[in-house]
Amino acid sequence: MEGCYLNQIIQRNHYLQKLIDRRENGLVKVITGIRRCGKSFLLFNLFYDYLIESGVKEEQIISIALDDDTFIKYRDPEELSKFIRSKITSKETYYILIDEVQYAIAKDELKNPDSIRLYNVLNGLLRLRNVDIYVTGSSSKMLTKDVLTVFRGRGDEVRVYPISFKEYYAAIG
């Protein structure tokens, strides 16, 4: 099959459904998995499109990719908090989508998860009651091991795995 490439989007509906099922549950949805397994695509494409199709206005979706130089300023948790709060201008529900949150955590903070300022910022945003927060990250030290402990019962993990053979085979027909 020389030169055979899969030039289509593989709908990972079971992961999308997990996010939909957790929508507005009052918890930070933490999407974890190894690098390049589709976390960002799930959040910024599939879930974003779902929100728009279900009637959410674009202004109510705050998307931030912390690995993008455009958002480098928001790697500081206080700046991130100010930015997000400045976008929340009504009582409607706002969907906060943050990609690669490990960029907002200092390496020395990883030694003591209770001192991580980002978690305090996200927990503070949850108190607004009209926000629904989704984050992704690849750092296993930061996300997978202690996610529920660090969020003090306010975290809900969605683990994403690389595409399976079953998904691939279904996509190629």
Please tell me what each predicted stretch does.
Residues 1-173:
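Phosphate-binding site recognition
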